[in-house]
Regions:
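Conserved Rossmann-fold dehydrogenase catalytic segment
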Residues: 130, 158-166, 189-205, 224-231, ...
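N-terminal helix-loop segment corresponding to the beta1-alpha1 unit
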Residues: 1-190, 368, 374-401
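Oxidoreductase and adenylate-handling cofactor-binding alpha/beta cores
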Residues: 155, 174-194, 207-217, 260-266
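Aromatic-enriched alpha-helical interface/lid elements that frame and gate functional surfaces
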Residues: 229-230, 234-310, 314, 400
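Terminal low-complexity tails and localization/encapsulation signals of metabolic enzymes
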Residues: 1-10, 224, 234, 240-241, ...
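Glycine-rich beta-alpha junction loops
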Residues: 41, 128-129, 201-206, 243-245, ...
Length: 401
């Protein structure tokens, strides 16, 4: 039996792009029914996330919108208000990532919805929250990377700022929002009362950065400069071998001794600069020059055999082209394939969580825009004639055949 603790919970998904879809995707992995409301223009990520056979289901969109029932509504049309009201009444959780002022205009804000339905769990994911001088400003992942100082970490280490080439802020904030919703559902089970949750991306990621890099500035008076000097070392990077690069980390005294022995640097075993955790912290620059030095006298495979044999955490540095072919990922079946109704054969990335010795099963394919519009309208109590009228006047749209 599949692990589905949220079975019977309906989530109304008013989100788009990445951060919100990550949140609702996670809830869907736990068995919740996700109803994704999409505008006639469609979720921006359908095209923005890369090329696809039809131009309507980028890889990113496919992977983050699995298991969601898609209804397409033109919220500018007056008769969609009743549809929204019925959807809200039927839902347990509402998730939105529009700007607060836009939600207020559509009467889709937490105050309005929970004023009518105090048992609802409402989660708003924003760039900057509903307070403070940045509130209401637009943002995207790269902007959050900049304003949180993530780009400044590269400036400090490499001499120029850079973005992490992943939508890391969206993914982190989305997962945190999902966790907050799960906690709110536990509270509702105990009290019968819902919650209004707010997850601002800026504060969320600023806290992540500061938890690691406030470092010596965490004390009054400070005991040193800001920044984890290990992580900010220019030598803290993959190490070059005879035929590529490998990644490894050595932290404990036992790991350091094993590393120095395996790499033929036994002369440093008694060096007082490196013979304890505190000594290496005081001499972090010199230590990282040692551990970051190239290992070009052997191939990556040879070094990995030696390092792993010494119980040192070490693995190859994959490229985007080689990652999916990793022997471990292939063995555990992280990636599979299925037939999509409009895109043909597509990759399926299952959830990485294992419960009671079983991985969570992948949900259904990401649906074309309006795929279940008619079906959901009927489930909400509209007659066949009413459904046809709403489709005919453009209030509701169905997927093209």
């Amino acid at each position: 039996m599949s692990f589905s603790p949220l079975k019977g919970i309906r989530v109304l998904d008013l989100t788009s792009v990445v951060v919100g879809p990550v949140c609702t995707w996670r809830l869907g992995q736990y068995g919740a029914e996700i109803i994704k409301i999409e505008s006639p223009d469609g979720d921006l990520m359908r095209g923005l996330g890369g090329l696809s056979p039809t131009g309507q289901h980028s890889g990113t969109y496919l992977h983050l919108n699995r298991g969601k029932r898609n209804i397409c509504l033109d919220l500018k049309k007056a008769d969609t208000r009743d549809i929204l009201d019925r959807l809200i009444a039927s839902a347990d959780v509402i998730v939105a990532n529009m700007r607060p002022q836009a939600l207020k205009k559509l009467a889709l804000d937490s105050e309005t919805i929970r004023g009518k339905f105090p048992d609802k769990v409402y989660c708003l994911i924003t760039g900057y929250g509903t307070e403070g001088p940045y509130s209401g400003q637009p943002t995207y992942d790269s902007v959050v990377q900049g304003v949180t100082g993530m780009t400044g970490l590269f400036l400090r280490r490499d001499g120029s700022p850079s973005y992490v080439p992943m939508l890391i802020c969206d993914h982190v904030a989305g997962e945190i929002a999902a966790g907050a919703i799960l906690a709110a559902m536990m509270e509702r089970n105990n009290t019968g009362v819902g919650s209004s949750i707010e997850v601002p991306m800026f504060e969320t990621m600023a806290a992540f950065v500061l938890q690691e890099h406030m470092a010596q500035q965490s004390f009054e008076p400070p005991v040193g400069p800001a920044g984890d000097l290990r992580l900010l070392s220019p030598q803290n990077k993959p190490v070059e071998t005879a035929d590529g690069w490998i990644a490894f980390t050595i932290n404990t005294n036992a790991q350091v001794r094993a590393f120095l022995s395996v790499t033929g640097r036994e002369s440093l075993l008694e060096d007082e600069r490196f013979n304890s955790v505190s000594a290496r912290a005081k001499n972090v620059v010199e230590w990282f020059q040692v551990r970051g030095a190239p290992l070009k006298n052997k191939t990556s495979e040879q070094w990995l055999e030696l390092l792993q044999g010494a119980d040192i955490a070490a693995q190859p540095c994959h490229t985007l082209e080689t990652l999916a072919q990793d022997k471990h990922l292939k063995s555990v079946g992280l990636i599979d394939h299925e037939q999509h109704p409009t895109e043909g054969k597509t990759a399926v990335i299952r959830a990485s969580i294992k419960v009671d010795e079983q991985y969570l099963l992948p949900r259904e394919f990401a649906q074309p825009k309006g795929w279940e519009t008619a079906q959901l309208l009927k489930e909400l109590g509209y007659s066949e004639n009413e459904v046809n009228t709403m489709i005919g006047n453009g209030s509701a749209l169905v997927a093209s055949s």
